[in-house]
Amino acid sequence: MSAYCQVTGRKPSFGKSVSHSHRRTNRRWNPNIQRRSFYLPSEGRTITLNVSTKGLKTIDRYGIESVVAKLRARGEKI
């Protein structure tokens, strides 16, 4: 599963790990991606999205119908 949120567009961020002796090594911070199924009453079917936890809050706030409409307007295939 890729570390990409379909709702918010969050991707991994990159930086450095710094040890006690200040040696720096590359690392990445992945968003907390959850694979969730949502029921769309207007279409009578369920869809599965890769969503970050912030994306889940967005869906709770605005509703799945409006979020899916924005995704389709953006060109996401659902």
UniProtKB/Swiss-Prot annotation:
GO biological process: translation
UniProt keyword annotations, A-Z: Ribonucleoprotein, Ribosomal protein
Pfam families xref list: Ribosomal_L28 (PF00830)
One GO location term (cellular component): ribosome
Gene3D superfamilies reported in the protein's UniProt record: Ribosomal protein L28/L24
Region spans: Disordered: 1-27
Alphabetized GO MF terms: structural constituent of ribosome
HAMAP family the record matches: Ribosomal_bL28
Family: Belongs to the bacterial ribosomal protein bL28 family.
Protein name (database record): Large ribosomal subunit protein bL28
Organism name: Corynebacterium kroppenstedtii (strain DSM 44385 / JCM 11950 / CIP 105744 / CCUG 35717)
Lineage of the species this protein comes from: Bacteria, Bacillati, Actinomycetota, Actinomycetes, Mycobacteriales
Encoding gene, per UniProt annotation: rpmB
